[in-house]
Amino acid sequence: MTKNNEAGWNLDHSYTTLPQSFYTEIPPTPVSSPELVKLNHSLAISLGFNPEELKKEAEIAIFAGNALPEGAHPLAQAYAGHQFGHFNMLGDGRALLIGEQITPSGKRFDIQLKGSGPTPYSRRGDGRAALGPMLREYIISEAMYALDIPTTRSLAVVTTGEPTYRETKLPGAILTRVASSHIRVGTFQYAAARGSIEDLQSLADYTIKRHYPEIEAHENRYTALLQEVIKKQASLIAKWQLVGFIHGVMNTDNITISGETIDYGPCAFMDNYDQGTVFSSIDTQGRYAYGNQPYMAAWDLARLAESLIPILHEDEEEALKIAQDEISKFSVQYENNWFLGMKKKLGLFSKEEQDHSLIEQLLKMMEKYKADYTNTFRSLTLNTIENTALFESPEFKEWYKLWQSRLEKQEESKENAYEMMKNNNPSIIPRNHRVEEALEAAVTNGDYSVMEKLLEALANPYAYSTDQEEYCVLPTPTNRPYRTFCGT
């Protein structure tokens, strides 16, 4: 155990107040020669750490699982999940929660080591992770944070000095993940499947205290909990859709109760606008396609509601009715969030009857002409209509006149409208081919400069800076079709 705490560790372990069926205490498995390859300075500071101390050998040993900081209580969390519609009892198969860091402002964040070795939930896996997927999670999660989308974050990546065997031999790595918590829809499914109402109540009470303390005194706090999670997910999924983010594996174990995006395995950002876009190699039926994400979120939340039925009301029929009523509200909340976001993307302050039609017409044209999602809105924001099939079409020219006329009707000036668009239309996203370039350089050549440059650009997606323009360039035909694999 590390005694020197100049690094700023301030760990608590409230999760162990839950019944022991929710976790297994287990130490991380040491690795041979850990090396720090990436540290998130700004995140470290916000968590109360001293970044310079975290670069020292004793702290790198903690990120590698070779040592534990003061106050650590390593454990693997148990949960269940519907994976592509099929229910399984799961758990942290290659991750350990080492504790909850209490920040200088009193906030609580899980500190989890991902790739830290086998656990009782590993299901024949080796408990390890490869460098490429861990760096990928770092890049995408930090890009999501900069886009103002609730997300888990990445504090550090260390290489282990040991190979990891997948289809081929790959360099091993461990990611330090930071989250408001790792409580998932699947955690509630796990509690419900075990059949103990006391355990289910314990989990619900703990979750309310940790994430939604304002509803503790609510006359039916478990209904209120369901309402809060639905509200958070309706907002989150709308934010995904508005930037063209495709999660790829929206299983119930990847839906957080806090409303943060988690698990960046087969995710990617859409290039051409297409409702049917799928990147994940294992999603052969398009279950988690871009256009399906709102529906799948509702499906996942229905599984949460099912799990809560034993504590929603003492009468089962009444509990079922409460669950159904609350789930039915998701689609309206999602639509409202999405519509408000789309209005901002088009600079619309006021509300007009034609707004829905204006938005739908644009999206239909974008799909028809295979227009790039991000760059179309970027061009509209800059009012630079480029030489593309969409912009040269008669339909678009007609639409553009209607849109300009709509902007002129507003009390707010066009300058204000374009300024709002700038704040809601990212100039750059983590383009799939640029992420792969960065990973190739880092993993194959040990050159992290490409990744650092990409991260620097992605940190300010709404800056519209000229030095970001290289990241707006579309992939060449050889970079398509892009496929992702569940490596994280």
From Swiss-Prot:
Please, which domain of life does this record's source organism belong to?
Bacteria
| First-level EC class | transferase
| Cofactor(s) the protein requires to work | Mg(2+); Mn(2+)
Q: Where does Mg(2+) bind?
A: N254, D263
- Reaction it catalyzes: L-seryl-[protein] + ATP = 3-O-(5'-adenylyl)-L-seryl-[protein] + diphosphate; L-threonyl-[protein] + ATP = 3-O-(5'-adenylyl)-L-threonyl-[protein] + diphosphate; L-tyrosyl-[protein] + ATP = O-(5'-adenylyl)-L-tyrosyl-[protein] + diphosphate; L-histidyl-[protein] + UTP = N(tele)-(5'-uridylyl)-L-histidyl-[protein] + diphosphate
InterPro entries registered for this protein in UniProt: SelO (IPR003846)
Q: Which GO MF terms does the UniProt record name?
A: AMPylase activity; ATP binding; magnesium ion binding
Where is the catalytic site? D253 (proton acceptor)
E.C. number, please? 2.7.7.-, 2.7.7.108
User: What is the disulfide pattern of this chain?
Assistant: none
Q: Which residues bind ATP?
A: G91, G93, R94, K114, D126, G127, R177, R184, D263
Keywords of the record:
ATP-binding, Magnesium, Manganese, Metal-binding, Nucleotide-binding, Nucleotidyltransferase, Transferase
Read off the PANTHER family from this record: PROTEIN ADENYLYLTRANSFERASE SELO, MITOCHONDRIAL (PTHR32057:SF14)
> Which function does this protein serve?
Nucleotidyltransferase involved in the post-translational modification of proteins. It can catalyze the addition of adenosine monophosphate (AMP) or uridine monophosphate (UMP) to a protein, resulting in modifications known as AMPylation and UMPylation.
Name the HAMAP family on file.
Answer: YdiU_SelO
Q: Which family does it belong to?
A: Belongs to the SELO family.
Please state what the protein is called. Protein nucleotidyltransferase YdiU
Q: What species was this sequence derived from?
A: Bacillus thuringiensis subsp. konkukian (strain 97-27)
